[in-house]
Amino acid sequence: MSLLSVRDVTASYGKVMALHGVTLNVGRGELVCMVGANGAGKTTLMKVIMGLVPAATGSVEFEGRSLLGMRTHDIAQLGIAYVPEGRGTLSELSVRENLRLGAFSRRWNAETRGDLERVLERFPILVERIDQTAGTLSGGEQQMLVIARALMSCPQLMLLDEPSLGLAPLIAARMFEIITALNEQGVAVLLVEQNAHAALRLAKRGYVIELGCTVLEGENLSENEGVLDAYLGGSLAAR
């Protein structure tokens, strides 16, 4: 059984259809990416999974349980963490306070304090900034903070939407290293990433989404000529 199963999902914003029957799966501990042009429906699909946008038809299941009709915070409590596009920090709160909010559904006790210590071990720069307000952090540090905050819920699955957006190349590369390390430690990841080249290299499998439809799925999509031409600017050998 897949950890996450999406089947023939359609969704709209008013009269505008955004998804036209998207299907995908994420297995336990798997890193899967979605690539496609802006407006293809990738972010909308993540919002459907999290209950932020209702599905018109189709099914979304997590560990065999339907997510359709569930409230977002109830979905999060099942073990799904969503890191949306952009800097989602609470800028006037400290790094420590932001991280504690990530465990909002859990009792603050020795276990959650231990989880905080383990999360901070992954992000040593946040230890140095622990009492700073989040709004004073650099863009890369803020992105690390929102991922760290999501980890405080101890998720089985993370939905990451454009985690490298707006980051300098070296910081983006560090972000990809963090994502790989999280996945290697057992956290499943569904990744939407503007840098299709990096995303397809990181992921075990990938999906191409066009105009709200799943048009291609498989391993080694970075070797597919159609994907190369559409999203990677031609042969990787030329890079």
Q: Where are the regions that the model predicts?
A:
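ABC-type ATPase nucleotide-binding domains, specifically the catalytic core motifs of the NBD
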Residues: 14, 70, 95-114, 122-124, ...
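The feature captures the beta-strand-to-loop junction immediately N-terminal to the Walker
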Residues: 35-37
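Helix-to-loop junction immediately C-terminal to a conserved catalytic motif
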Residues: 50
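Conserved ABC transporter NBD signature motif
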Residues: 58-66, 78, 111-116, 216-218
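Conserved ABC ATPase signature
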Residues: 133-137, 141
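Conserved beta-strand-loop-alpha-helix hinge in the C-terminal portion
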Residues: 213-233
